[in-house]
């Protein structure tokens, strides 16, 4: 990366995915539009490596996060006569999480301490946008706080901006933040990722994006077989309406080895958060789902993502 392309802020935070492009849109016309809001250090329309035909999405990278914010605040955008959908680009690592491409206005905040009040959450998260609702979850029987909360914003971009940040400190303690998905959204994440053909905002670089032929496979990756939002329990935050612990009603969805990505021992509230009954995370091409924070582990044989490979799918072109 050249000096001019390495400002203080990480590149991932300065990058936008642009979906819904006209097939007539070129790198030049995309650049011409988005450089109205700042200096672009990179701009590319993703194309099929064989036919060179546009895949209908691209990426623009600004010199500063401030310019990204300006572009997002200028929505809606129309490029070559077509309204396009800009979103904060999702990193390679984050793109493996179910629902990473979904547009939501609510976040899950885990690992918060018992003395954390609503004002602590508001004071921290209002820097990202207008907050509509804050819910600190408590045990229905004892009234004791359960160590997590939900925050709802008025704009999905606030959520997108928050989740690409790796570290958040609320009330003096580090916490973990994820998009909050309802049952239907989890099911959508399970089914839609099987053949997205590159329409998602997964893409860290010039090459792959998330698209391709059958990515995320039909062999159990996030679908059926006890995956996140799988078949038996349907997934969802708070299966029976009482918070975060009801991920699959039978423990099959979102199982793990005792914690949600190692940031909170939510399983002590419910057996539903325990080991999976459904086998492996990611079917045949990755390791076990749970245990020691493996839930978000990168699949082995990962290929295509963000590179120049023609397969553009996870698993080095393997099809399930």
From Swiss-Prot:
Involved in the packaging of pre-mRNA into hnRNP particles, transport of poly(A) mRNA from the nucleus to the cytoplasm and modulation of splice site selection. Plays a role in the splicing of pyruvate kinase PKM by binding repressively to sequences flanking PKM exon 9, inhibiting exon 9 inclusion and resulting in exon 10 inclusion and production of the PKM M2 isoform. Binds to the IRES and thereby inhibits the translation of the apoptosis protease activating factor APAF1. May bind to specific miRNA hairpins. This is Heterogeneous nuclear ribonucleoprotein A1. The keyword Transport applies. GO terms for biological process: alternative mRNA splicing, via spliceosome; cellular response to epidermal growth factor stimulus; cellular response to glucose starvation; cellular response to potassium ion; cellular response to sodium arsenite; import into nucleus; lung development; male gonad development. The gene is Hnrnpa1. Residues 95-185 are annotated as: Globular B domain. Keywords: Acetylation, Cytoplasm, Isopeptide bond, Methylation, mRNA processing, mRNA splicing, mRNA transport, Nucleus, Phosphoprotein, Repeat, Ribonucleoprotein, RNA-binding, Spliceosome, Transport, Ubl conjugation. Residues 4-94 are annotated as: Globular A domain. Transmembrane segments: none annotated. It comes from Rattus norvegicus (Rat). The modification Asymmetric dimethylarginine is found at residues 194, 206, 218, 225, 232. It is found in: Nucleus; Cytoplasm.
């Amino acid at each position: 990366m050249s000096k001019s392309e390495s400002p203080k802020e990480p590149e991932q935070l300065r990058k936008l995915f642009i979906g819904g492009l006209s097939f007539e849109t070129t790198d030049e016309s995309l650049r011409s539009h988005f450089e109205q809001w700042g200096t672009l250090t990179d701009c590319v329309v993703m194309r099929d490596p064989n036919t060179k035909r546009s895949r209908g999405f691209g990426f623009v990278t600004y010199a500063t996060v401030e310019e990204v914010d300006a572009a997002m605040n200028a929505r809606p955008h129309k490029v070559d006569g077509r309204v396009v959908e800009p979103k904060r680009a999702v990193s390679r690592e984050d793109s493996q999480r179910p629902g990473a491409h979904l547009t939501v206005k609510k976040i899950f905040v885990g690992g918060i301490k018992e003395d954390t009040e609503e004002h602590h959450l508001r004071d921290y998260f209002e820097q990202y946008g207008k907050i509509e609702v804050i819910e600190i979850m408590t045990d229905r029987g004892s009234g004791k706080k359960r160590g997590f909360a939900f925050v709802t914003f008025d704009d999905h971009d606030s959520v997108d901006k928050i989740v690409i940040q790796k570290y958040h400190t609320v009330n003096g303690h580090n916490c973990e933040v994820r998009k909050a998905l309802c049952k239907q959204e989890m099911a959508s994440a399970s089914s839609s990722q099987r053949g997205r053909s590159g329409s998602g905002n997964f893409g860290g670089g010039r090459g792959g994006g998330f698209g391709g032929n059958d990515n995320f496979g039909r062999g159990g990756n996030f679908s059926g077989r006890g995956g996140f939002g799988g078949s038996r329990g349907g997934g969802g935050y708070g299966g029976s309406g009482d918070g975060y612990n009801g991920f699959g009603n039978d423990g099959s969805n979102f199982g793990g080895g005792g914690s949600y990505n190692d940031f909170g021992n939510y399983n002590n509230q419910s057996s539903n958060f325990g080991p999976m009954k459904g086998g492996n995370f990611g079917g045949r091409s990755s390791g076990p789902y749970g245990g020691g924070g493996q839930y978000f582990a990168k699949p082995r044989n990962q290929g295509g993502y963000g590179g120049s490979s023609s397969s553009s799918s996870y698993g080095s072109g393997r099809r399930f």
